[in-house]
Amino acid sequence: MTAYEMNFDGLVGPTHNYGGLSYGNVASQSNSQAISNPKEAAKQGLAKMKALMDMGFKQGVLAPQERPDVAALRRLGFTGSDPEVIARAAREAMPLLVASCSASSMWTANACTVSPSADTADARVHFTAANLNCKFHRSIEHPTTSRVLQAMFASQEHFAHHPALPAVSQFGDEGAANHTRFCKSYGEPGVEFFVYGRSAFDSRYPAPARYPARQTLEASQAVARLHGLSEEGVVYAQQNPAVIDQGVFHNDVIAVGNGEVLFYHQDAFLDTDKVLGELGSKLAGRGGNFQAVCVPNSAVSVEDAVKSYLFNSQLLTRADGSMLLVVPEECRNNASVWRYLEQLTAGNGPIREVRVFDLKQSMQNGGGPACLRLRVALKEQELAAVNPGVVMSLELHDRLVAWVDKHYRDRLSEADLADPQLLIECRTALDELTQILKLGSVYPFQMT
């Protein structure tokens, strides 16, 4: 049966700012307090979506969250009218206002974990919203994320939605950023690869010392159970704690997989040989031929991998079966990374082409091409059941660019977040967006 991988990119929200909220994310920390350009950020993301659509890839869009999140501030004790809540938070607890304004939902790789119908017990596509409980600014996303996903994938015949796991550190879940699926073809049963940073309940597992491990083994196992995955179709691997301490806060900063190929750094995992062996044997059991492409430390250091976001790239299968790697501009600007990529594409391995995109506004907050997209493998009838309002087309692209031009600022500082007019601008924009994308009422301000 014909099936496709569809990428749903996050539309950058109108409050995109550099709050430096993500401890363990080097770019986020180092660009804290810089002036952001929400209009440019949204257009850079839309340009990538259009370019991939023009290349023949299936492309969709995922709506941003309502920000500032006044309801979250109310839960923290701020009272009064909505503008009064924002003014009081700005006066008494600016870091909380900054967190409530974060546009981090643009990184839809963290929205949820997706298992395609070929892998699940009930032959439906399963979604589990990620609790993102490691960071306050992201932990408030999942209720709206769930509503948006249900509006996009509404058919109960084809799609199953699970709420986020319990919001405690033992079940810390960062979604698809720590999940990859290998398969011979998208419509056939595959092997789902879950990467975790630590175990919550077994102290024998090592853990990083400097930065937090955001994903637990127990969270990954729970998602696999919820999705009805068989043991033959799942591999768990522990991320190398040493690279977490070097700024590799998600697996998608040090590895990317697609089809039968895993592109990874030499230091990405613990027990690498065992992990690769299990992936190879389980994929062979499902008719596939696993190919591992290892980038050695001698070619690209972990530091350069993190600076350039070499692995936070999109690995896409072209019509002829070869693969395309979509990387940020920062890869071209890093001598050792670019030298490696030129050698990689000149060889006779599976990755034959590299495409470079300018995603500077997202990159400065620590999110590259892979962060910005959620992959969903869909069979023909499932694709037909997706809400057509979120499927990218030339008409939708142009409409969204015009919408951004109409509603977004081209300069946003931390002080601007306290502007009561910003709240009105954002709600006006999102109200219009839900009509453009045919989502219905998904935002708290639309539901009161």
From Swiss-Prot:
Family per similarity comment: Belongs to the succinylarginine dihydrolase family.
GO BP of this protein: arginine catabolic process to glutamate; arginine catabolic process to succinate
Domain of life: Bacteria
Subunit organization: Homodimer.
Reactions it catalyzes: N(2)-succinyl-L-arginine + 2 H2O + 2 H(+) = N(2)-succinyl-L-ornithine + 2 NH4(+) + CO2
Pathway entry: Amino-acid degradation; L-arginine degradation via AST pathway; L-glutamate and succinate from L-arginine: step 2/5
Protein's name according to its UniProt entry: N-succinylarginine dihydrolase
Catalytic site positions: E174, H250, C371
EC code(s) of this entry: 3.5.3.23
Annotated residues for binding of substrate: 19-28, 110, 137-138, 214, 252, 365
GO MF assignments: N-succinylarginine dihydrolase activity
Organism of derivation: Ectopseudomonas mendocina (strain ymp) (Pseudomonas mendocina)
Keywords: Arginine metabolism, Hydrolase
EC main group: hydrolase
Gene3D superfamilies: Succinylarginine dihydrolase
Record's function text: Catalyzes the hydrolysis of N(2)-succinylarginine into N(2)-succinylornithine, ammonia and CO(2).
